[in-house]
Curated annotation (Swiss-Prot):
A GO biological process held by the record: mitochondrial electron transport, ubiquinol to cytochrome c
UniProt-annotated binding residues for heme b b566: H97, H196
Miscellaneous section: Heme 1 (or BL or b562) is low-potential and absorbs at about 562 nm, and heme 2 (or BH or b566) is high-potential and absorbs at about 566 nm.
Protein name stated in the entry: Cytochrome b
Gene name in the database record: MT-CYB
Protein function: Component of the ubiquinol-cytochrome c reductase complex (complex III or cytochrome b-c1 complex) that is part of the mitochondrial respiratory chain. The b-c1 complex mediates electron transfer from ubiquinol to cytochrome c. Contributes to the generation of a proton gradient across the mitochondrial membrane that is then used for ATP synthesis.
Taxonomic classification: Eukaryota, Metazoa, Chordata, Craniata, Vertebrata
Localisation per UniProt entry: Mitochondrion inner membrane
Regions that span the bilayer: 33-53, 77-98, 113-133, 178-198, 226-246, 288-308, 320-340, 347-367
Length: 381
């Protein structure tokens, strides 16, 4: 009799995705982040669900309800800290996952890559509306500043902003709808993750060499289930260390004060994982230009597959492109640092140079390096 795992309609899907999946034998730990992101999503949905049971989305009680969760609900402090820091771990894994995709040429699976970029945007939107919910000072002013960017859209901008706000300022209507969005978006993300996996399993995984791995594949279970379990253990350890010992390390001190529309914080800035995009936004002294640059900083990922000029898929054997990749990584760290600094010299000029370099590396330097490496591969005799 055939194994039920291979015949049952539902079990068969799980089996083909996580058990008998033919996987390249040489994929490194950089391929762990997909499963880690899946676990992050589950953690965020579960902790979020328990927080939603006690949270009230009203301007008068939102801040107090979060304090109530931390003080009076059994393990409420832990659930909240896991949720807040889980978001940071989520974004660390996301950035590493995207970085891996760029380094090893995984973007050449265009459908998988495109749905991945849309996923990244959706997760960023989810995190943004979620940050508004505790209704602290930075929550309120962050929401005000970022939603206000839409007013840069010609003709319809102001109307659009007031439509999103549900009034003439960020108020009760805004908070209520942001809570509704924050609740529904993770489930939309989950559906998109399934589509992401569906497209990935059409082609199979890429591998560090960038060569066709069909000749040498091994079953996902037990080889990669155990390998993913190690990564999972390390991620959970990092999350628990953060949540237990320094839960407020990545947050903003201004968010300990309830939202006050009459008092603007000295430095309005988003959570650390948006700072690179925020720095790009601020580096352009024109509102509409800044908004377009902000959008392009993420949407540029969609054009990367069309800018691939090399005969090799991966950067594994391409030292010039490797150098540019790590320069881009350093540039993103610089932008993240600048995004958290006040708007004054020398930070303004550093931010502008870093922003130009970001787009220059992706649009011009990497494709040129690919062509140069192709030329260097040609026999010269």
């Amino acid at each position: 009799m055939t194994n039920l795992r291979k015949t049952h309609p539902l079990m068969k899907i799980i089996n083909d995705a996580f058990i008998d999946l033919p996987t390249p034998s040489n994929i490194s730990a950089w391929w762990n982040f997909g499963s880690l992101l899946g676990v992050c999503l589950v953690i965020q949905i579960l902790t979020g669900l328990f927080l939603a049971m006690h949270y009230t989305s009203d301007t008068l009680t939102a801040f107090s309800s979060v304090a109530h969760i931390c003080r009076d609900v059994n393990y409420g402090w832990l659930i909240r800290n896991l949720h807040a820091n889980g978001a940071s771990i989520f974004f660390i894994c996301l950035f590493l996952h995207v970085g891996r995709g760029i380094y090893y040429g995984s973007y050449l699976f265009k459908e998988t890559w495109n749905i991945g970029v849309i996923l990244l945007l959706t997760v960023m939107a989810t995190a943004f509306v979620g940050y508004v919910l505790p209704w602290g000072q930075m929550s309120f002013w962050g929401a005000t500043v970022i939603t206000n960017l839409l007013s840069a859209i010609p003709y319809i901008g102001t109307t659009l902003v007031e439509w999103i706000w549900g009034g003439f300022s960020v108020d009760k209507a805004t908070l209520t709808r942001f809570f509704a969005f924050h609740f529904i978006l993770p489930f939309i993300v989950t559906a998109m993750v399934i589509v992401h996996l569906l497209f990935l399993h059409e082609t199979g995984s890429n591998n560090p060499s960038g060569l066709n791995p069909d000749a040498d594949k091994i079953p996902f279970h037990p080889y990669y289930t155990i390998k993913d379990a190690l990564g999972l253990l390390l991620m959970i350890l990092l999350l628990l260390l953060l949540a237990m010992f320094s839960p407020d390390m990545l947050g903003d001190p201004d968010n300990f004060s309830p939202a006050n529309p009459l008092n603007t914080p000295p430095h309005i800035k988003p959570e650390w994982y948006f700072l690179f995009a925020y720095a790009i936004l601020r580096s352009i002294p024109n509102k509409l230009g800044g908004v377009l640059a902000l959008l392009m900083s993420i949407l540029i990922l969609l054009v990367i597959p069309f800018l691939h000029t090399s005969k090799q898929r991966s950067l594994m054997f391409r030292p010039i492109s490797q150098t540019l990749f790590w320069l881009l990584t350093a540039d993103l760290f610089t932008l993240t640092w600048i995004g958290g600094q006040p708007v004054e010299q020398p930070f303004i000029i550093i931010g502008q140079v870093a922003s130009i370099l970001y787009f220059l590396i992706i649009i011009a330097l990497m494709p040129l390096a690919g062509l140069l490496e192709n030329y260097m591969l040609k026999p010269k005799w």
